[in-house]
Every structure is written in structure tokens, then in C-alpha cells.
């Protein structure tokens, strides 16, 4: 466990940083005042490549750990199986690789495979109870963002959200963390778990990083990612070719990485004929400079240099 590095309002501010929303901030503030163990969890379907999108989630778990939370990482092997990600053996092997990557990022956590408890009798009965308490339309809506690419969804896509809600109960979770694509499932858990005699979880939703091609989210299946174990040449080449439209911020993956990963202030070194050297004290200044005409290649070079510095130690530990 990390020693506390923040306290009081600073602790809440650290947890809020770089999140899309917390439901609710008032509940989080009250939880931070309480004594005793507090549990925060996030679930990951084992994935072939751990990338910056995953790392953004892990950074938030580290923030929570520094605030005194016990961290549980659910390696959701049964969820991945229901989502047609491979055989259980293949998924478990990926889970072990993912665990090593998360540990290499500096996260100290309890790692739990879903199959370790999701096949138990009590868990199964609770899934049935949730099925009785949830309308079919409500369950389908909760999976819309997660399964939107599936043209012919299976019945499993309705079971999936019920299991995820049940995970929160059976892992004794106080705070559920995920990307914005998890919001509908988390809201379902807040709505339905109190009716089963369990507390409503506080929910932290993090941004979804745009893929390097500018089309949809950063994803292992699409290959539009920077993996945490990419080498220096690969990182430079990927950023060189990344979608980064001049003066446009919205949906710009390079600017998103600059927002969530760069350590400010930053220096951009340029010849005098191109405006000379530039010092940017925060992301807001970088965004303003970009809108005013800072060249995409200057930003790409800056982001590549800092990402290499951040990811090199992680890559070395993963080897």
C-alpha cells in the first residue's frame, strides 16, 4: 500500500483529476472521511495489447491507492468468453500477460479472475435475482456502447451487464472505475443493488482515448494504439503517422495524449524562422497554441519524446 500522499480536499482533487465524471462527488467526499477499508475496483477483459487507454485507467487506480483505497483488478475471463474473445485457456494466458503489464506500471493490487467466484452458487443465484429485477430493454441499453460493433448480438450480451453488477456486490466494492463506455452498466448497479440490500457504488468514469487513426476509440482489435511495451522507433513512427488535423482539437488523438500524459511545463524547440522556442506551462496553453497555428509535427515530436520517457521503464519491466 502506498503511504498517503494527499489529504482532505487535495485527496479529492487528486481523484477528480482527468476524470470525465464521478457519481457522485458528494458521496466520494463522505467516503474519504470514513475510517476502515475502502475498496476500489476496475474490470478488464484480458486483451492482447495493453495500450495507453488501459494505462489511463491504471493511473486512476494508482491515484485511488495513494488515497488509501484497497485496489482490486478483476481479470474478467468469463466476461471475455461471453464477449467471444477466445477460449478460456487463451483468455487466461492473456490475463497473466496483462497482470504483468499492470504491475510494471507500478500498481499494487489484488488480482482476481472472474471464474474464481462467478461460478459459485451464491453468485449464480444473485444473477437470477438481478435478471428478475431488470427489464430486457434496460439490460440491452446498458450494453449499447460496449457491444455497438456486434451486428448480431447473442443472449450473452444481456447476461454480461447482470454479471458486472453482481461483481460489484460480491467483491464488496465501494468505488467502481471504468471508461465512459461503462456508464450505463454502472448506473444500472446504482439503481438496482440497493433493492437487493447492497450499497450503491460510487462510480468514476474516465475518458475514452481516441485511436491514432482518429476513428473511434483506441483498441487492440483495431491496432490504432500505442502499446505500453512499444519501442522508441515504433512510438515515433506511430505518432508521425497519427491523425492530427491542423488547428483542430476535438477528436485529435495526439492532443488527447498530450492532455493526459505530458508532464508540464514542456518545451518545444524550434528555429527562429518558425517562431523560436516555446514554453507551455499546462495543457490549456498547448491547446491554445495549437489552435493558433502550432504545427502538428511539433506536437507529435513533443508527445513522442515524453511518451518514450514514460514507457521505457514499463517496457523494460515487461520483458
UniProtKB/Swiss-Prot annotation:
Cellular location(s): Cytoplasm
SUPFAM superfamilies recorded: Nucleotidylyl transferase
Cellular compartments per GO CC: cytoplasm
This enzyme's EC code(s): 6.1.1.1
HAMAP family hit by this protein: Tyr_tRNA_synth_type3
InterPro entries linked: aa-tRNA-synth_I_CS, aa-tRNA-synth_Ic, Rossmann-like_a/b/a_fold, Tyr-tRNA-ligase, Tyr-tRNA-ligase_3, Tyr-tRNA-ligase_arc/euk-type, Tyr-tRNA_synthase
GO biological process: tyrosyl-tRNA aminoacylation
Gene transcribed to yield this protein: tyrS
Keyword Nucleotide-binding: yes
Residue ranges of the motif 'HIGH' region: 46-54
Quaternary structure and partners: Homodimer.
Catalyzed reaction equations: tRNA(Tyr) + L-tyrosine + ATP = L-tyrosyl-tRNA(Tyr) + AMP + diphosphate + H(+)
Annotated binding of ATP, by residue: 220
Full protein name: Tyrosine--tRNA ligase
Residue positions binding L-tyrosine: 41, 160, 164, 167, 182
The entry's keywords: Aminoacyl-tRNA synthetase, ATP-binding, Cytoplasm, Ligase, Nucleotide-binding, Protein biosynthesis
Family indicated by similarity: Belongs to the class-I aminoacyl-tRNA synthetase family. TyrS type 3 subfamily.
Species assigned in the record: Methanococcus vannielii (strain ATCC 35089 / DSM 1224 / JCM 13029 / OCM 148 / SB)
A Pfam family hit: tRNA-synt_1b
Protein function: Catalyzes the attachment of tyrosine to tRNA(Tyr) in a two-step reaction: tyrosine is first activated by ATP to form Tyr-AMP and then transferred to the acceptor end of tRNA(Tyr).
Keyword Cell cycle: no
Residue span of motif 'KMSKS' region: 217-221
Major location category of this protein: cytoplasm
Molecular-function annotations in GO: ATP binding; tyrosine-tRNA ligase activity
EC class: ligase
